[in-house]
């Protein structure tokens, strides 16, 4: 394991490794211990008590964070006719049909989110092996396969984030930047927490929020006290 830098160790020393902080304290500490020389992302990791091997315990979706993420998302929309015009009017960065399928097959990836109307999924499906591993494949569960392309694009531009539980049951998400006011980051955190609470599978047993941590892009993690989380 690579040795951590002196700056990292100094930042980590400000955190009590045995303590679980309330959300406000955790966010404030994460900001304070950021060691990056740029406006780093503030990230959260929820370790959930789910068994992702079971189909009814798969957690995936999307949520619009009230204060956005601070990141500009480049949106590619696969649509035609009136729906293509709607997507362009809503602010999509790229709108098209087969020409973008070819571009992607040739290695073009200058976008962050892909939206498609259902009638375009036959074409988009050709990109499954390319988009799937990158987490870019449109999916009805995240609202990216839809006829309402206007709403989809506007929500993404407003700060919509997708979340998905990994095999280990961990959900990672960005809740903003270190330049955000603490209360705005806390509001984003609680919005995501509420969504995950509502997504709890009925068959999930035992403790649901096993552990939660807040961190910045390069900073140390801060453990969050989950005892006040309501289920």
Swiss-Prot record:
Pfam families: Ribosomal_L1
Gene Ontology CC: one annotated term: large ribosomal subunit
PROSITE patterns noted in UniProt: RIBOSOMAL_L1 (PS01199)
Entry keywords, A to Z: Repressor, Ribonucleoprotein, Ribosomal protein, RNA-binding, rRNA-binding, Translation regulation, tRNA-binding
UniProt keyword annotation of Repressor present: yes
Top-level taxon: Bacteria
Keyword Ion transport: no
Single Gene Ontology MF annotation: structural constituent of ribosome
InterPro entries: Ribosom_uL1_bac-type, Ribosomal_uL1, Ribosomal_uL1-like, Ribosomal_uL1/biogenesis, Ribosomal_uL1_3-a/b-sand, Ribosomal_uL1_CS
PANTHER family referenced in this protein's UniProt entry, alphabetically: 54S RIBOSOMAL PROTEIN L1, MITOCHONDRIAL, LARGE RIBOSOMAL SUBUNIT PROTEIN UL1M
Quaternary state and interactors: Part of the 50S ribosomal subunit.
Similarity comment text for this entry: Belongs to the universal ribosomal protein uL1 family.
Matching NCBIfam families: rplA_bact (TIGR01169)
UniProt protein name: Large ribosomal subunit protein uL1
Organism (species): Staphylococcus saprophyticus subsp. saprophyticus (strain ATCC 15305 / DSM 20229 / NCIMB 8711 / NCTC 7292 / S-41)
């Amino acid at each position: 394991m690579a040795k951590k830098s002196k700056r990292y160790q100094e930042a980590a020393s400000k955190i009590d490794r045995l303590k679980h902080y309330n959300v406000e304290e955790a966010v404030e500490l994460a900001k304070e211990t950021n060691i990056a020389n740029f406006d780093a992302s503030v990230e959260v990791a929820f370790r959930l008590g789910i068994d992702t091997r079971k189909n009814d315990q798969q957690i995936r979706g999307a949520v619009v964070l009230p204060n956005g993420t601070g990141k500009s998302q480049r949106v590619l929309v696969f649509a035609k006719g009136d729906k293509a015009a709607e997507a362009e009017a809503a602010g999509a960065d790229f709108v098209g049909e087969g020409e973008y399928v070819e571009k992607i097959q040739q290695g073009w990836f200058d976008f962050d989110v892909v939206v498609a109307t259902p009638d375009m999924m036959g074409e988009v499906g050709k990109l499954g092996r390319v988009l799937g591993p990158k987490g870019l494949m449109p999916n009805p569960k995240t609202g990216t396969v839809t006829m309402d392309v206007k709403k989809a694009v506007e929500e993404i531009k407003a700060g919509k984030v997708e979340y998905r539980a990994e095999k280990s049951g961990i959900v990672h998400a960005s809740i903003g930047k270190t330049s955000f006011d603490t209360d705005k980051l806390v509001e984003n955190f609680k919005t995501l927490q509420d969504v995950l609470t509502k997504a709890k599978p009925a068959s999930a047993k035992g403790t649901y929020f096993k552990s939660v941590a807040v961190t910045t892009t390069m900073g140390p993690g801060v453990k969050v006290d989950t005892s006040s989380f309501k289920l």
